[in-house]
Amino acid sequence: KKITLDFQETGKTVLTDEKWLLFVVEQVLSNALKYTPEGGTIRIYGDGATVVIADNGIGIREEDQARVFEKGYTGYNGRADKKSTGIGLYLCRQVMDRLNHGISLTSRPGQGTLVRLDLSREWRMVE
């Protein structure tokens, strides 16, 4: 698909459940890869307390954004060839809530989506 992945390491370490946080990151990246067109870009950056995954994919309509974390909600993804169960972001929200972290999403159709993982609700930086 020839997608550019731009990853900016912070060099910071946060104490959290690595397995479940990795699950969330993988799910969000999977969505970004699915909905980013050939030649697109996915950026991963943050400051240690926040991780941002942003793409320049097809985006999500404003009326669908409030519901993307609901179980089974798929919304209109604009592409019939992209099947979705509507369970991925729901599970991400459940995991982040259990870890006492936050997850939010902003998007513009035709411009892409930005998912913010807020680890600052309960976190400690490791020096």
Q: Which residues fall in each region the model found?
A:
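Short helix-loop "hinge" at the ATP-lid/N-box region of the Bergerat-fold HATPase_c
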Residues: 32-33
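Short beta-strand/loop element within the Bergerat-fold HATPase_c
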Residues: 39-50
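Acidic ATP/Mg2+-coordinating residue in the GHKL
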Residues: 55
